[in-house]
Amino acid sequence: IQSTSMDQGILTEDSMNSFIRTLIQAGIWKNKVPKQTARTKDGMQTTVKKTEAEADAMASQDTRLGFQPIVSVDAELLRQQRRFSSPRVLLSENTPLEPPPLYLTEEPVVLNRTSRRKREGKSHRGEYSVCDSESRWVTDKSSAVDIRGHQVTVLGEIRMGPS
């Protein structure tokens, strides 16, 4: 991957999109996993090199099952992108232990065009995933540590309108 202007200043959304395109073009996100981690009798992890035939057979089986392998990205590449800030994306060297819960963020269909026009451009319905300091997805706690390291209270329910 060649160095671009992203290394030198503030990242815009366009530069982040081009960064992701560069990763895809470089083949980092391909479905090939050349090594497999195996456990020995004493519990230690070892890295086992697969043959090309084994890797292809496993890739075709994983594709049928809908499995997408996690691909490692160079840590230096992530350090260069630390300035990118998004409530939905967190570039990290560590992968979470579980996938995030899926939330539907689409608004209900409203027949009144006037209220829809007032609401356009205002997005107050974002649902943010809250991670604790152990990089696990939290769904059942009343307090947690957010992605900036601050202690936050997790609300069980949010009441809107007059009570």
Curated annotation (Swiss-Prot):
Where is carbohydrate linked to this protein?
112
The stretch of residues making up the signal peptide is 1-3
Q: Is Protein transport one of the keywords?
A: no
Sorted alphabetically, the Gene Ontology BP terms of this entry are: cell surface receptor protein tyrosine kinase signaling pathway; modulation of chemical synaptic transmission; negative regulation of neuron apoptotic process; nerve development; nerve growth factor signaling pathway; neuron projection morphogenesis
User: Could you confirm whether the keyword Transport appears in this record?
Assistant: no
The record's InterPro entries line, in alphabetical order, gives:
Cystine-knot_cytokine, Nerve_growth_factor-like, Nerve_growth_factor-rel, Neurotrophin-3, NTF3_N
Subcellular localization is given as:
Secreted
What would be one Pfam family of this protein? NGF
The alphabetical list of record keywords is: Cleavage on pair of basic residues, Glycoprotein, Growth factor, Secreted, Signal
Taxonomy, superkingdom? Eukaryota
A single GO molecular-function term is:
nerve growth factor receptor binding
Q: Which GO terms describe its cellular component?
A: axon; dendrite; extracellular space; synaptic vesicle
Task: Extract the SMART domains matched here.
Answer: NGF (SM00140)
User: What SUPFAM superfamilies does the annotation carry?
Assistant: Cystine-knot cytokines
- Chain residues in the propeptide: 4-119
Function according to Swiss-Prot or TrEMBL: Seems to promote the survival of visceral and proprioceptive sensory neurons.
Record's family? Belongs to the NGF-beta family.
Kindly provide the name given to this protein in its UniProt entry: Neurotrophin-3
Q: What organism does the UniProt record list as the source?
A: Chilabothrus striatus
Q: What's the source species' lineage? A: Eukaryota, Metazoa, Chordata, Craniata, Vertebrata
Gene responsible for this protein: NTF3
